[in-house]
């Protein structure tokens, strides 16, 4: 993560630029999807721009990121050729993954974006293993695993959180809570009101942030 804890005017403008890019990219993508140009499912980051940029922007190029099925905003923030990203989602051979990954399997190894994952909770084990490798190699790099609140209901979340706590791994589980897993509300799928409280059971440091403050708080804490 970046060593500086105070955001400069230049950084704030760069973050705003990223948020605008995410919004316009996904809005254009929505139009293409409605016209039948995109095969399969695609999940937009509209409304979550600040949550994505605020958390991912402070990362260094060397830090590793594992995203989820709703990874457009995180992928754009970490860094990618926007034309290759669009081509990938459209299934073109000029895409980042030659058109074979699509919306839910974007990646860019040049900036250590280790890939999005179409399986809910699919990044838990991958990111935990990567964090263990970073610790063993003493790289000083941090691993960030992005997910929605429903992914914290998966058994792998609790297993990996427990292992990360025991081994003191350089791993951040970043949860964007939009209150719903498809059509299932948080109230019907879990008894905790604050998802962040789940970390306390494993003695893992945690904090909760409102979207409009996430950039400032992630920079100061990470």
What spans do the regions from the language model cover?
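Conserved small/polar residues in nucleotide/adenosyl-binding loops
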Residues: 212-218
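A positional/architectural concept
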Residues: 161, 171-173, 177
């Amino acid at each position: 993560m970046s060593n500086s804890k105070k955001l400069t005017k230049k950084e704030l403008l760069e973050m705003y630029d990223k948020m605008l890019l995410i919004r316009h990219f996904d809005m254009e993508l929505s139009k293409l999807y409605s016209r039948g140009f995109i095969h399969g499912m695609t999940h937009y980051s509209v409304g979550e721009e600040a949550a994505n940029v605020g958390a991912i922007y402070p990362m260094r190029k060397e830090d590793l990121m594992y995203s989820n099925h709703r990874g457009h905003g995180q992928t754009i923030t970490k860094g990618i050729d926007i034309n290759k990203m669009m081509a990938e989602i459209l299934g073109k051979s000029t895409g980042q993954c030659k058109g074979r990954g699509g919306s839910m399997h974007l990646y860019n190894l040049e900036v250590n974006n280790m890939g999005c994952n179409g399986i809910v909770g699919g990044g838990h084990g991958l990111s935990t293993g990567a964090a263990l490798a970073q610790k063993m190699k003493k790289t000083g790099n941090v691993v960030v695993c992005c997910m929605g609140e429903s992914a914290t209901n998966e058994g792998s979340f609790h297993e990996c959180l427990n292992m990360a706590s025991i081994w003191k791994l350089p791993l951040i589980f970043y949860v964007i809570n939009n209150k719903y897993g498809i059509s299932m509300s948080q109230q019907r799928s879990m008894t905790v009101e604050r998802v962040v409280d789940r970390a306390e059971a494993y003695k893992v440091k945690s904090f909760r942030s409102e979207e409009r403050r996430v950039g400032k708080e992630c920079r100061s804490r990470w």
